[in-house]
Amino acid sequence: MFFQQKFRLLATLIGLIFLTLLFNVYNLQTSDREASLVSVKKQTLDTFYIPSPRGEIFDANNNKLVSSSLEPHLFLNLRKINDNNRSQYEQYIQYNFVDLGEDVIDEIFESEDLLVRIVNIQDINFDNRQSLVSLEAFEIFDFPVRKYEYNNIASHIVGYLGEPSLEDAKDFPLSINPNIVGKSGLERYYEDDLAGLPTEIIFKDDEIAQIIMGTPGKDIFTSLDINLQTIATESLLQGIELANEKYETKNKVQKGAIVVLDIRTNEVISLVSLPDYNPNNFVDGISQTDFNKLNISGAFINYPIQGQYPPGSVFKVVAYWLAEQENIFPEGLSSRNQRINCKGSLSFGFDDGSQQVYNDWKEDGHGNVDLGSSLKQSCNVYFWDIALKIWRDYEGTTAESILQEYARNLGFGTATNIDLPYEANGVVPDRELFENWAISQPERVRPEGWLGGDLMNLIIGQ
């Protein structure tokens, strides 16, 4: 009996000791876990990205159009800025980099980035650079500098750089981290090739733990001839100036375009659009005011591929081909060699007895012309007569749009698929288009819809 009581007492004591040990082990594990979490939190790694040098862009003769170079830049490590030293760094930056305005300096210190690029210190000597890094919140890193060697020349071809928008983030997700992306021209079209991979600067707390070097972008070689491009640009500027001198009007000529193709390869060797801009102004950022001025002027529009304008009399080539292939000639003619007498206007009657008169650009007319000479002299009357015959013979049938079909077979109405962004499709007007516009854009069409006069305008490229 005594032995049993003694055994129970011993068992109870052992049980209490075991529970105490178990409780201590639990506390120890919990404390270790919390300590580990604190340690992990303190050791959270953050990454800052610096863009690698973008690929360079060359013309057909290996002239460098756009270059990239690495130059030392001063950065501010904001994790080392606190209430005690902020004013010291603000004053230092204001005193040593007087070109930076107060607004810019405020933006630097209010940034949410780990590192903020302050200024290019390429022209600062080595000793002064060393004095900069003696201040613990300053860091020096090589940063790529983009230079557009010909300023405004070929700006619509090479394009410019800027901060990525939400749309850019979807199109070029890899360009978000270095926070720079091609916004137009070749810079945008070949963004994935030109950008390369950024350098990664990995932070542990407020110190740099590791640097993973990036990969430079790929070079781009174009068909452009920069010498011809320069001549074409200067010629267009002179032409605009001459037009404004000759024609006194409030609406000054400001826009123009030139495209030169190599007839052997169809490569673009010159493409000029005015007004233009200097891509160098975007390298370090452009003010909203200056950006708005360029935008209002139409400088960002690449007119050769985005301007939707009537082609003019060059469209008569389409009508020429149609006449040759379909044997459609002015009323009374049955071959290309037969002639009409162009007196400077075309007159024809409507069913109600009224008359319509179309006047040629040459008031006294072109005289006797056949298909070939009418194209050579750009005789409107001859081609109006062809359009009138098409309308009278085929109005309301599928053949009514035979001219448009020939135009589309030659590429009118579609994009050229040139390797530049934002190209607009052309427009070949016909009855179907007018009917669609009547629903979606009624302000663009008359209530009576597509008429023979529209076909007559189209055949001379208007």
Short names for language-model regions:
Residues 64-66, 102, 106, 207-211, ...:
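Beta-lactam-recognizing serine transpeptidase/beta-lactamase-like catalytic domain environment
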Residues 1-286, 399-409:
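Periplasmic/cell-envelope proteins involved in peptidoglycan metabolism and beta-lactam response
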